[in-house]
Amino acid sequence: MEELARESISLLGKSGLEGGTPSLSSMGAIFIMLKSALGAGLLNFPWAFNKVGGMHTAIMVELVSLIFLISGLVILGYASSLSKHSTYQGVVKDLCGPAIGKLCGICYIINLFMICVAFLRVVEDQLEKLCDSIHSNNTLYAMSEVSQSWYMDPRFAITVLCLVIILPLSIPKEISFQKYTSILGTLAACYLTVMIIIKYYVMEHPVLIKHEFSSNAASWASMFSVVPTICFGFQCHEACVTIYSSMKNKCLSNWAAVSVVSMLICLLIYSFTGIYGSLTFGEAVAADILMSYPGNDVAVIIARLLFTISIITIYPIILLLGRCVIQEAWLNHREKSLFVTLTYERCVRVVITVLWILVTLLIALFVPDISEVISVIGGISAFFIFIFPGLCLVCAVESEPMNTKAKSCLTAWGAISVVCGAFVFGQSTTIAVMEIIAKF
């Protein structure tokens, strides 16, 4: 995300966004790319690996997707160098025109909104396990059959959390005080990977271990079902333009190396998590891997707390990004008919914030599990990973002098990216909607 990227660059003392000299190193760029990509998406990988039909098929799909992921990053760096913009939307609008730029802005808001839904769904899952753990340890509960108290209901807990903690953190116009906690998502992801690997070897009584995965069982439909999870997990393309603009060495080959290294590290982390998580639980693996582990396991409780705290601190930043786009569009529209005061701006900010939190909370409360949310996010992510980079490449080569053969090859690759992105969006979104309807 662009705001996370800016804050990371600021923390490294490498800011090049305010007119200064860009001085972000390649290692710093890799670190920020990892920070932008690693997060709550990791929880869904073991489930996706099992659903796709086994580790071999899942890794093959990952490797094919990696070609497009890296290609999109390189294209966006190239497009940024041509447009001289430091934001994703600015690059798309400059190269592809205002109409595509508006579409990019709409997709950007929807993507941020659904990420917030996924975050709240993850928090609710963790609160459910924590409440169950506290409730099961109650000696009175062991002696009676009294139902769980209403205040131990995770839906009540997540509602209180949103109103008491997340809402006050999200209302301020500036939330720079939270930038030091944004690394918690990366820390939680790395901790989860190590924990899953260790648990695979030390667990004495795993739940329904199934090590048999038949490659023949993986149909084309099941193969494509893992793509939304990959798109959500590896998604850092919105931030990459800001990162590239802040780099000292903007050579395209250097940016390509940064993209390859960061994506390969993500590949290792996600693959190890998916492999060991699916091997541990087999078909019993939950859409949120932490839900498959016992509620009273200390190591798992630490992972739940890390993810919960990281989401609580990152949610307001994601909300800020979406709110800024909506608020800017609304205020620009109102300025044409009346003078906008500070009081009016404050009221608009509060209303957008409250509505954003309430709607995302309501959706998170009624969505069956995180897999459906990730399918929708993965479909929307296809615009940022496949479609917009492909369009930028097609538009860029038309304005750049180059030989006919190179122009034809690049145009063809851009068209392939757009077509693949449209397919991923349509397929994943349709399946997600159908699965949600079927569960209700």
Swiss-Prot record:
The keyword NADP is assigned to this record: no
The organism's place on the tree of life at top rank: Eukaryota
InterPro entries listed in its UniProt record: AA_transpt_TM
TM regions (residue ranges): 29-49, 58-78, 100-120, 156-176, 183-203, 223-243, 255-275, 300-320, 350-370, 373-393, 418-438
Membrane topology of this protein: Multi-pass membrane protein
Keywords: Amino-acid transport, Ion transport, Membrane, Sodium, Sodium transport, Transmembrane, Transmembrane helix, Transport
Localization: Membrane
Annotated Pfam families: Aa_trans
Protein transport keyword on record: no
One Gene Ontology term, aspect cellular component: membrane
Biological processes per GO annotation: amino acid transport; sodium ion transport
Function per UniProt: Putative sodium-dependent amino acid/proton antiporter.
Record-stated family: Belongs to the amino acid/polyamine transporter 2 family.
Entry protein name: Putative sodium-coupled neutral amino acid transporter 8
